[in-house]
A protein has these predicted regions:
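Short coil-to-helix segment of the ABC ATPase nucleotide-binding domain corresponding to the Q-loop/switch region
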Residues: 98-106
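Conserved ABC ATPase "signature" region
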Residues: 117-128
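The feature captures the beta-strand-to-loop junction immediately N-terminal to the Walker
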Residues: 39-41
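A short, flexible loop at the N-terminus of ABC-type nucleotide-binding domains that lies
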Residues: 1-2, 11-25, 74-77, 116
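Helix-to-loop junction immediately C-terminal to a conserved catalytic motif
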Residues: 54
Length: 128
């Protein structure tokens, strides 16, 4: 599975007096099986970039391809994309709030709409 960003630009509040360019012609290629880390100062665009990787934000300009398909094409399966493109937060203790580790690990499968049984089965497998 590959993820390619081509000349991705993103502007907050485009067309207003408050317009801010957060990403400016970003090009990035993440190959099959690769893991990446993104570092930078506060306000440098890290979170904005990451939100583009699974289609949470739509680029103002440019394109994003997952396995060769443009994720911005009409009727693209964004839900399917989000089941395959994952993120790990820098400070997970600020992101997860469940009473047990198992319930925290169920977070991803739960958001995929899986049954409680399937969530727990996948979480237990991941924790082995």
């Amino acid at each position: 599975m590959s993820l390619v960003l081509e000349n991705v630009t993103y502007r907050y509040s485009q067309g207003t007096a408050y317009e801010i360019t957060a990403l400016n012609h970003v090009n990035l290629s993440i190959g099959d099986g690769e893991f990446i880390g993104i570092i930078g100062h506060t306000g440098s665009g890290k979170s904005t970039l990451v939100q583009h990787l699974n289609g949470l934000l739509k680029a103002t300009e440019g394109a994003i391809y997952f396995n060769g398909e443009n994720i911005y094409q009409e009727k693209y399966d964004l839900r399917g994309l989000r089941t395959q493109v994952g993120m790990v937060f820098q400070y997970p203790e600020h992101q997860l709030f469940e009473a047990t580790v198992l319930e925290d690990v169920c977070f991803g499968p739960k958001n995929q709409g899986l049954s409680k049984e399937e969530q727990q089965e996948r979480a237990r497998e991941a924790l082995k």
